[in-house]
Each structure stands twice: as C-alpha cells, then as structure tokens.
C-alpha cells in the first residue's frame, strides 16, 4: 500500500488489499462501529475521494478524485462522481449507477 501525502487522509477499513495506492485527503471510513469498507487488491483511490460504510471496492478498480462511494464497486471498474457511478467496466466505457 502506498499513501501519497498522508496528512488529511483518514483510513478506517476492515481490510486493504495488496498494491493499493491512496492519494491525499482520502477518507475511508465506517458509518458505525461494525461497518467498515473492504478494499481489494490493486485499487487506486484518487485525491479527495470518500469511501464510507460497509462497501467493497473490487480488485483492480479505480475511484476517481472527489468521488463519494457508498455502494459496492465491482472488480475491474472505474467510478467517479457524487454519488459514484461506474464509467468503465472490464476495459469498456459504460455509464451505470452503483
């Protein structure tokens, strides 16, 4: 795991997989004491993104800058926006709500 500029970055995850890249001002947090995110392998989370609650970020996925993720992200996907939506899945452009 690589955390770029760890200041203002909050991480409270159930698990973070291998080879993850987390940029500055990211929040990975829980919605209560038992609901923490689970981050898969080879995940990149860009600056300012928020991953909140008992959600899973699938392997090989990207969370775009300032995205707000409150639902599961499938493997091999890119999500952006508030609330986050899928814009790429398995290498193909899509537009899907989470």
List each language-model region with its residue ranges.
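Structural signal for interior beta-strand "rungs" in well-ordered beta-sheet cores
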Residues: 1-87, 92
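C-terminal membrane module of polytopic membrane proteins
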Residues: 81, 97-98
């Amino acid at each position: 795991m690589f955390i770029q500029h760890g200041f203002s970055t909050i991480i409270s995850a159930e698990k973070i997989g291998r080879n993850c890249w987390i940029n500055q001002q990211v929040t990975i947090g829980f919605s209560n004491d038992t609901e923490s995110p689970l981050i898969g392998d080879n995940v990149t989370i860009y600056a300012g993104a928020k991953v909140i609650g008992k959600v899973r970020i699938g392997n090989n996925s990207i969370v775009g800058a300032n995205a707000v993720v409150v639902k599961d992200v499938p493997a091999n996907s890119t999500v952006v926006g508030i609330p986050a939506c899928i814009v790429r899945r398995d290498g193909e452009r899509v537009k899907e709500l989470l």
